[in-house]
Regions:
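Ligand-site clamp/hinge motif
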Residues: 230-275
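Bacterial lipoprotein signal-peptidase II cleavage site
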Residues: 23-39
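N-terminal lobe/hinge region of extracytoplasmic solute-binding protein
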Residues: 60-109, 140, 208
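Ligand-binding "clamshell"
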Residues: 149-152, 274-279
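Gly/Pro-rich hinge or "lid" segments in bacterial periplasmic/extracellular proteins
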Residues: 97, 182-236, 241
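Short, well-ordered beta-strand elements
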Residues: 53-66, 104, 113-117, 135-139, ...
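Aromatic- and charge-enriched surface segment that lines or borders ligand/interaction sites
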Residues: 104-145, 167, 253-256
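Surface-exposed binding/hinge segments that line
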Residues: 107, 150-193
């Protein structure tokens, strides 16, 4: 199963995919491709079976997102949001295998050349198609951005062969390249949207991705809301909306969970784990 596919199975799994860890751990400054793993601490509305069946999910996290622009993302919290709003060329499944996302297949023509075939039905949330030009634009832009330079340093050239084929030429053989194209900070952006918005790209009204959800509201340091993308080209998620509340204090997140104010909580403090699990 694709890691992104976890979010499509049930509403509980949709929310669980947004949780890196439940008890212990913390927010790290790194790019992330599919935030999964660990066990999510949840409140349920179905008699305690452990599965959330509601479609409007409320999640408590300890920190806010930093950016809505993939090329500016290096923190995990922003990566969680970006993963659900944008798509990458490839993804990694639960077994660690490289699987298709926007690209349905790829061909390794040599140690330094890869060609990806894009899905022809993939589109951004405004209905415009995702093309090889958008992929080229994304990677060319990333080479000039401080937080994505390292990921793209071994890419010599990106060529849009036609609308749905894109070729990467590397400076040297690079075994990690196939995982680089799964990174959230290399999620594909719309050339038209970024060009039109200029420096304002990343504002809520300018964000345009091709993932399962769109960002409909962001109140910094308070909450953000994701709404199901009606133009999504993949399997429809069961969750129709996800509201993420920023609650910095760990004990306050736990209290909100136990009171039923939130359905899931990011990083239950170790001292509260036993109480949450027993409740």
């Amino acid at each position: 199963m694709k890691r992104r596919g976890i979010a499509r199975t049930t509403a509980m799994a949709m929310a669980a995919a947004m949780i890196l860890t439940a008890c212990g751990g913390g927010n790290t400054d790194q790019s992330t491709n599919a935030p999964a793993g660990g066990s999510a601490q949840t409140a349920t509305d179905n008699g305690g079976s452990g599965e959330i069946t509601k479609t409007d999910i409320v999640v408590a996290m300890g920190a806010d997102v930093v950016t809505l622009d993939p090329a500016g993302q290096q923190d995990t919290t922003s990566g969680v949001l970006i993963h659900h709003v944008y798509s990458t060329l490839m993804d990694i499944d639960e077994e660690g295998n490289l699987v298709p996302d926007l690209a349905e297949s790829y061909e390794m023509k040599s140690d330094t050349e890869y060609t990806f075939k894009l899905r022809e039905d993939a589109c951004f949330s405004d209905g415009t198609p995702v093309t090889a030009k958008d992929v080229k634009f994304t990677y060319d832009r990333a080479k000039d951005m401080p937080k994505t330079k390292s990921n793209t340093s071994k890419i010599a050239e990106v060529i849009a062969d036609d609308d749905y084929h894109v070729t990467f030429k590397l400076t040297q053989p690079y075994a990690a390249f196939k995982t680089i194209v799964t990174q959230t900070n290399l999620s594909i952006v719309s050339e038209a949207a970024v060009t039109a918005a200029g420096d304002a790209y990343g504002d809520v009204e300018n964000v345009l991705g091709s993932g399962e959800f769109t960002v409909t509201e962001w109140v910094p340091n308070d909450h953000y809301t994701l709404t199901k993308n009606e133009k999504y080209w993949g399997t429809e998620p069961i969750a129709t909306s996800i509201t993420v509340r920023v609650i910095p204090e760990g004990s306050a997140r736990t209290i909100a969970l136990e009171a039923g104010e939130v359905d899931l909580v990011w990083n239950v403090d170790p001292t509260d784990c036993a109480n949450v699990e027993a409740n």
